[in-house]
Amino acid sequence: MPQSALFTGIIPPVSTIFTADGQLDKPGTAALIDDLIKAGVDGLFFLGSGGEFSQLGAEERKAIARFAIDHVDRRVPVLIGTGGTNARETIELSQHAQQAGADGIVVINPYYWKVSEANLIRYFEQVADSVTLPVMLYNFPALTGQDLTPALVKTLADSRSNIIGIKDTIDSVAHLRSMIHTVKGAHPHFTVLCGYDDHLFNTLLLGGDGAISASGNFAPQVSVNLLKAWRDGDVAKAAGYHQTLLQIPQMYQLDTPFVNVIKEAIVLCGRPVSTHVLPPASPLDEPRKAQLKTLLQQLKLC
């Protein structure tokens, strides 16, 4: 089985649950993990954008990775986000993830400098060479300021056999279509996962493999059921779930960054966890909590 086969379907980018003093809330995180696995997800991604990796130090990231891997205990594949602004720390975190027992790593491009294509390729190759784990690229140009183009991704897939997929977080059907055509056309087992809830259906229609999207934290059943209907050949039923997913991104407009929105949605949908977030994020105020509750109720998610 190709390494990439581990990372298809619905893989929530798990929110990191914190205590009021900013420490990892182990019981809260464990309960969320258990809920998601029971919901039928295909894997779990820790320390992505929604996991607040960018607000954490390297040792904190290692501790969270270790806890998550140990608690999942091989029930589903685990991806650990290891990217950042410098190659040395990314390599250190990637090697730690491998030693801790991760199934793969997710690596975003450096996001302070605008990096030349040659240097981007070198960066990802250095990270891929530092581990034997499967490496999933992470494209989020709205936050990094720099797109990983399909041509660049194909070059990386050509170059390193353990670069096996991409989380393509971009609000563009054309970009997803080109990524699938360009990279999967040359490497059929290369995994293309969308990063936005409302792109899951069209990603599957285009020949992609699933989603790593935020609603997996508070409404995993919608994406899980959409994918099941798709795999069963019931396109009309899948399209019905798509109608719900189309409405979810409006919730994320309630604040920036919207990690607080996700945690409040988890609570409103029935899992009482701490909604503490790390600066520069801040708690969602009461008026916006009320707006969020109304949106979730309109979609019959709570």
From Swiss-Prot:
Q: Name one GO molecular function term.
A: identical protein binding
Question: Which domain of life does the UniProt lineage start with?
Answer: Bacteria
Q: What is its main location?
A: cytoplasm
**Record-linked SUPFAM superfamilies:** Aldolase
Q: Which reaction does it catalyse?
A: 2-dehydro-3-deoxy-D-gluconate = D-glyceraldehyde + pyruvate; 2-dehydro-3-deoxy-D-arabinonate = glycolaldehyde + pyruvate
Q: Where in the cell is it found?
A: Cytoplasm
Name one process (GO BP) from the record.
Answer: aldonic acid catabolic process
| Pfam families in the record | DHDPS
> InterPro entries annotated for this entry?
Aldolase_TIM, DapA-like, Schiff_base-form_aldolases_AS, Schiff_base-form_aldolases_CS
Q: What is its EC number?
A: 4.1.2.51, 4.1.2.28
Induction trigger = Expression is repressed by the transcriptional regulator XynR.
Tell me the active site: 49 (charge relay system), 112 (charge relay system), 138 (proton donor), 167 (schiff-base intermediate with substrate)
- What this protein is called in its record is Putative 2-dehydro-3-deoxy-D-gluconate aldolase YagE
Q: What is the lineage of its organism?
A: Bacteria, Pseudomonadati, Pseudomonadota, Gammaproteobacteria, Enterobacterales
* Gene name of the encoded protein: yagE
